[in-house]
């Protein structure tokens, strides 16, 4: 089993992969930055119907389930009153926050006064449920605040992280900061309990780390970035505990060695993805080469030994995660939808750190074949697990008792525009081929990007770039790793270009040029060894 190999190897890791805080340069990396989806309007034969269903079906389903079919909103109402029972699972608060994040993203591209009113009503309930010291978690408020912060597996920081993501999103969408202020009070409460010279804490389900980076970027408060870094550094030192409620499994919780010494993936798949996202975010802002080296090793292990052809990860139902390398059964595959979304999130971050298109290749695979499999074309039925083989008894469901995947999709789909374009000091990057119009500003230059394509059904892409003044940036078009031959032209004239890390690099272009990329979409087989 993989975990036993990890245990046996841990002594050697101290010598073979030794890195320390000295690897931190304390200067942000010169990295690629995504073009936010708020600047991108999608008009695409493949994606537009799905985004329309998100508005008309997915969000209404989530709202109905949260308000009427389950007790999720009622938990906040009861917590505000300080009476009543807690309904559902101890981490159900997170589904409400994720759905609210999805509502915020929807409001950016589809303003809706009624939806905004609904979101404001929810936020009022969150604020009312917050304790005087800033703590907010309906499970412990209703079952006993004396037990809070005693079991690292009870998802307190996980729920807080999703609240922070929702608070940041809603503030960016509407300018309203009521929820953001709730998040700040909760974070300050956590920092009063944990940190250097205080109590140790290893979040049983990662999420808070990447959320704290978003809070830092929104508030520019360095302490939140430092807290994210401290939480990452807590792992692998024997601090994990479930109190008197069970035995802590360091492999399952990614707590077997310090994160800098990680060499291969183990444990719960979604937790791994969120951990790696947090590491990537902190690495970028602190220029931590130790974190980057660890993620290089982990990515190689995930993609070459533990990933399905669909881009799905996590084969085991027992731990919702990983067992041995190459243990990838079809019929019994787990491949949780949330894990595929996590692959998208992590691989985008790796691309931003490196400028290598191999990460977008994996992102695209996980997006189209893993994450999207989790939702019906009607937008109202969902898969939690995504096996590659079925005997006809595996069907999408309206909802789940553990509803992390439906609520995950409610926030992921409307933000799909985040993954199309990126920018760096010297280039504009085109990562995904989706019909859209992008309006962005770089420095003093306004840029209009228009992309026309029938991708993924066809490999032809037409990109028109108009600028308010000359822009001295390269255009970098990703050439997918499945594409063996392609033609590239500007204004109908074929051009030859160099390739760097999987991107066709166009250096000579001017405003209103029409760049055409024609990729051969050929069928090919991908063989797996039987031994």
Predicted features, each with a name:
Residues 475-476, 507-520:
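C-terminal beta-strand-rich structural cap/linker in extracellular carbohydrate-active enzymes
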Residues 15-16:
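C-terminal motif of bacterial Sec signal peptides marking the signal peptidase cleavage site
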Residues 524-529:
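Conserved small/polar residues in nucleotide/adenosyl-binding loops
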Residues 7-12:
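Bacterial N-terminal signal peptides
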Residues 142, 146, 154, 180, ...:
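Asp-box/WD-like beta-propeller blade repeats and closely related beta-sheet repeat scaffolds
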Residues 483-507, 523:
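Solvent-exposed beta-strand/loop surfaces of large extracellular or lumenal domains
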Residues 24-113, 117, 147-173, 206-223, ...:
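Aromatic (Trp/Tyr) and acidic
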Residues 1-4:
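Positively charged n-region of N-terminal signal peptides that target proteins for export
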């Amino acid at each position: 089993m993989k975990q036993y190999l990890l245990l046996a190897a841990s002594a050697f890791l101290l010598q073979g992969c030794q890195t320390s805080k000295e690897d931190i340069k304390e200067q942000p990396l010169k990295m690629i930055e995504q073009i936010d989806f708020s600047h991108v309007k999608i008009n695409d034969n493949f994606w537009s119907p799905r985004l329309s269903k998100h508005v008309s079906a997915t969000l209404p389903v989530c709202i109905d389930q949260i308000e009427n079919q389950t007790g999720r909103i009622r938990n906040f109402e009861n917590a505000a009153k300080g009476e009543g029972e807690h309904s559902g699972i101890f981490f159900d608060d997170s589904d409400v926050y994720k759905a609210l994040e999805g509502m915020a993203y929807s409001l950016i591209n589809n303003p809706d006064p009624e939806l905004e009113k609904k979101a404001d009503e929810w936020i009022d309930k969150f604020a009312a449920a917050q304790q005087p010291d800033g703590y907010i978690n309906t499970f412990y408020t209703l079952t006993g605040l004396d037990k809070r912060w005693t079991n690292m597996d009870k998802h307190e920081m996980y729920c807080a992280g999703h609240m922070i993501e929702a608070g940041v999103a809603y503030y960016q969408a509407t300018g309203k900061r009521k929820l953001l202020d709730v998040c700040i009070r909760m974070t300050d409460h956590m920092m009063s309990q944990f940190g250097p010279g205080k109590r140790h804490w290893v979040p049983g389900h990662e999420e808070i780390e990447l959320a704290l980076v978003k809070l830092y970027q929104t508030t520019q408060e360095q302490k939140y970035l430092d807290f994210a870094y401290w939480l990452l550094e807590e792992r692998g030192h024997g601090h994990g505990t479930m109190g008197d409620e069970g035995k802590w499994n360091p492999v399952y919780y990614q707590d077997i060695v310090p994160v800098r010494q990680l060499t291969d993936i183990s444990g719960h798949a979604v937790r791994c993805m969120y951990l790696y996202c947090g590491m990537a975010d902190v690495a970028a802002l602190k220029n931590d080469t130790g974190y980057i080296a660890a993620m290089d090793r982990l990515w190689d292990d995930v993609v070459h030994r533990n990933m399905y052809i669909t881009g799905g990860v996590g084969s085991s139902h027992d731990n919702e995660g990983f067992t041995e390398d190459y243990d990838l059964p079809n019929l019994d595959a787990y491949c949780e939808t949330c894990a595929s979304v996590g692959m998208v999130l992590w691989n985008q971050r790796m691309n931003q750190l490196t400028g290598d298109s191999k990460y977008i290749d994996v992102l695209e695979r996980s997006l189209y074949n893993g994450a999207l499999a989790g939702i019906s074309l009607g937008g109202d039925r969902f898969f939690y697990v995504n096996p590659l083989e079925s005997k006809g008894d595996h069907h999408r469901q309206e909802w789940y008792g553990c509803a992390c995947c439906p609520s995950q999709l409610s926030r992921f789909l409307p933000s799909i525009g985040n993954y199309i374009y990126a920018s760096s000091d010297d280039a504009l990057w085109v990562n995904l081929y989706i019909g859209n119009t992008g309006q962005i500003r770089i420095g003093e230059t306004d840029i209009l990007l228009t992309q026309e394509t029938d991708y993924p059904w066809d490999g032809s892409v037409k990109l028109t770039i108009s600028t308010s003044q000359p822009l001295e940036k390269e255009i970098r078009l990703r050439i997918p790793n499945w594409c063996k031959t392609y033609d590239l032209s500007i204004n109908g004239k074929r051009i030859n270009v160099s390739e760097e890390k999987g991107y066709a690099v166009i250096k000579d272009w001017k405003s209103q040029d029409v760049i055409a990329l024609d990729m051969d979409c050929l069928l090919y087989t991908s063989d797996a060894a039987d031994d």
